[in-house]
């Protein structure tokens, strides 16, 4: 399993680098050797934009093959032209790459602990939205919006009637990778999420080295802090598929925005626009947070007295033009095809997703005290040692906030005000979610989105703290003790955060995986239910666990028309699930008890407590 997962990551990393290297080198050459850090993230953004534009016409697996021809050719040309300078920062690129793959493997610990590739985390949108959508897209293009799909499955209905909220991107990358590499979808879901989250290391590394002009060791410390952030493991376990793909793009887009405004580079600004242009179609809320943070960055440039405001015109125009062009199709779907109204009307999303019904306290937000201790669906008791060390964990949380504030102050005094401003703008948006909207889930998600930047500013304060102290006349003689103090604080935080992340990973293992081996064994149903048949799952008293099982049944029966009657529990999980259709209009009925009419039992699954019945009459009365 480990070798297979690592091989998948290497393939994805190589492909995305080929896809994004040429554009990155062409537009952001002024960033020197550090631009190579962004190549795979730029490649991911290009791929997502390709899905947004093309999957209404072709099956998703065609998109990467179409894109790799022009963008791969461009990468080849740019490598040939700039091969001497491409690896000028080879140490940063190498260590960031190793950190990315290490983080990827650490995130997949919950999958490896299951002993087989499956949906390893909490059962939610992974089984009800993303996997069914990807399964439909294995051999179909996106269905037309708001039209009854020709093949009526859980995935096709979702894509047709709510897919405009994620135009072109829901399930596309899973379907494409599955078709090309021949991996089953249930084995790909968590690795793709882990890979996207791990790519954030490269994005934030660029921000630290170029945006903050910090040292190599500051970038290493930032990566370690991010790799031990419990909210990243929480994101993976919850199966937040769109966010996992969008997070590295979000970070890279902001890093490029700050760099472009500072350097006055229209090319880097255009690249920032292209990268950010993938966000509205990928995950609209993160596009909103991006806009808020980028606006803060621009205001910091414009408002500062010494700024040459004329230098901002070209990069701003380039960024806006590139962003609008890249996101045009997504914006059309969000506005004209009512995708935005779906986001605005999703009032029930405030209690269901993420299991967040209350605001996390500051010690949990800092990451040093395990959030798994209070996360409502699977709250776990603190261990004996954790209970004894709780005062130290609280102290570490206080140090996190202190270092974060010092890091922001240092950035401001070192002339890195736009970089500090984007973080402050994000914090203001989180405050708005908490105090004005009173939305615990939205607030917690903003904390997740800002985790990479929080890691950067904490590391920026802790590493080489003595250099900053030396610039303060009253305490300049204490620079060496300040360095030692900063490193000691960093070690304490890393140990506490690593413990919290370990507890978060263990929390997911308390619950069975979303798809157990028995659930995956339901694929045997395909042997008795031919393709093209119509199937009704009849289980009106379905509990939440049984709804997940119904999702597994649907996954086991691709290319069959699929309808569910499951009562009112978690209403909206399946289309009109509380309306019983006429059973005799279906070729097969699956359920715990016999349906009405001339159905005969053809198969039983005692382990899953499901029976398969086939219509035996010639007409439906």
Label the predicted regions.
Residues 1-96:
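Membrane-embedded, hydrophobic transmembrane alpha-helices
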Residues 20-22, 72-82, 191-212, 402-407:
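Transmembrane-helix motifs of polytopic, lipid-linked glycan transferases
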Residues 39-51, 98-106, 179, 192-262, ...:
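Membrane-embedded helix bundles of polyisoprenyl
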Residues 103-249, 447:
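Active-site lumenal/periplasmic loops and adjacent helix-entry segments of GT-C-fold
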Residues 128, 194-197, 243-249, 288-289, ...:
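Hydrophobic/aromatic-rich transmembrane helices and adjacent perimembrane loops
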Residues 208, 298-305, 317, 321-325, ...:
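Hydrophobic, aromatic-rich transmembrane alpha-helices
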Residues 229-230, 282-286, 330, 461-462, ...:
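Transmembrane alpha-helical segments
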Residues 317-324, 461-502:
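Signature aromatic-anchored transmembrane alpha helix within multi-pass, membrane-resident enzymes
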């Amino acid at each position: 399993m480990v070798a297979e997962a690592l091989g998948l990551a290497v393939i994805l990393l190589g492909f995305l680098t080929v896809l994004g290297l040429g554009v990155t080198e062409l537009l952001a050459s002024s960033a020197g050797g550090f631009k190579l850090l962004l190549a795979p993230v730029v490649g991911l953004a290009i791929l997502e934009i390709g899905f947004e534009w093309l999957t209404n016409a072709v099956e998703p697996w065609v998109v990467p093959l179409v894109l790799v021809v022009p963008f791969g050719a461009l990468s080849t040309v740019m490598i040939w032209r700039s091969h001497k300078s491409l690896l000028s920062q080879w140490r940063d690129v190498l260590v960031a790459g190793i950190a990315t793959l290490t983080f990827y493997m650490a995130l997949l610990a919950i999958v490896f602990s299951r002993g087989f590739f499956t949906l390893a985390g909490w059962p939610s949108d992974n089984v009800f939205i993303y996997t069914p959508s990807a399964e439909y897209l294995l051999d179909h293009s996106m269905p037309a919006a708001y039209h009854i799909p020709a093949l009526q499955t859980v995935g096709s209905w979702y894509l047709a009637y709510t897919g405009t909220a994620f135009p072109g991107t829901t399930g596309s990358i899973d379907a494409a990778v599955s078709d090309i590499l021949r991996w089953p979808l249930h084995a790909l879901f968590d690795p793709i999420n882990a890979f996207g989250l791990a790519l954030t290391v490269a994005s934030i590394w660029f921000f630290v080295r170029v945006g903050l002009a910090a040292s190599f060791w500051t970038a290493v410390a930032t990566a370690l802090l991010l790799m031990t952030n419990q909210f990243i493991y929480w994101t993976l376990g919850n199966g937040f598929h769109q966010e996992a793909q969008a997070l590295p793009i979000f970070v890279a887009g902001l890093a490029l925005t700050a760099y472009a405004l500072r350097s006055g580079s229209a090319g880097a600004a255009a690249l920032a626009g292209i990268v950010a242009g993938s966000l509205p179609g990928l995950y609209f809320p993160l596009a909103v947070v991006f806009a808020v943070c980028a606006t803060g960055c621009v205001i910091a440039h414009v408002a500062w007295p010494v700024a040459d405001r004329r230098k901002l015109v070209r990069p701003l125009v380039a960024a806006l033009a590139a962003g609008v062009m890249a996101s045009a199709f997504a914006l059309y779907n969000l506005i004209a095809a009512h995708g935005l109204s779906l986001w605005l009307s999703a009032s029930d999303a405030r209690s269901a997703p993420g299991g967040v019904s209350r605001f996390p306290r500051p010690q949990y937000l800092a990451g040093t005290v395990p959030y798994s201790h209070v996360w409502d669906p699977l709250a776990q008791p603190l261990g004996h040692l954790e209970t004894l060390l709780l005062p130290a964990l609280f102290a570490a949380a206080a140090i996190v906030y202190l270092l974060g504030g010092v890091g922001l102050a240092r950035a401001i005094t070192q002339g890195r005000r736009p970089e500090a401003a984007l973080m402050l703008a994000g914090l203001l948006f989180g405050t708005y979610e908490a105090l004005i909207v009173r939305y615990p889930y939205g607030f917690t998600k903003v904390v997740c989105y800002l985790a990479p930047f929080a890691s950067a500013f904490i590391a920026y304060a802790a590493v080489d703290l003595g250099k900053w102290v030396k610039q303060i006349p009253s305490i300049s003689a204490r620079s060496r003790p300040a360095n030692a103090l900063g490193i000691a604080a960093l070690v304490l935080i890393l140990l506490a955060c690593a413990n919290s992340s370990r507890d978060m990973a263990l929390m997911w293992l308390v619950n069975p995986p979303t798809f157990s081996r028995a659930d995956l064994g339901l694929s045997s149903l395909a042997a008795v239910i031919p393709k093209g048949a119509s199937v009704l799952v009849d289980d009106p008293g379905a509990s939440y666990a049984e709804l997940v099982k119904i999702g597994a049944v649907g996954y086991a029966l691709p290319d069959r028309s699929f309808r569910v009657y499951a009562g009112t529990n978690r209403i909206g999980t399946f289309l009109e699930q509380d309306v019983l259709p006429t059973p005799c209009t279906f070729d097969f009925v699956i359920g715990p008890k016999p349906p009405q009419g001339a159905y005969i039992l053809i198969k039983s699954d005692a382990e899953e407590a499901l029976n398969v019945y086939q219509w035996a009459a010639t007409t439906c009365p």
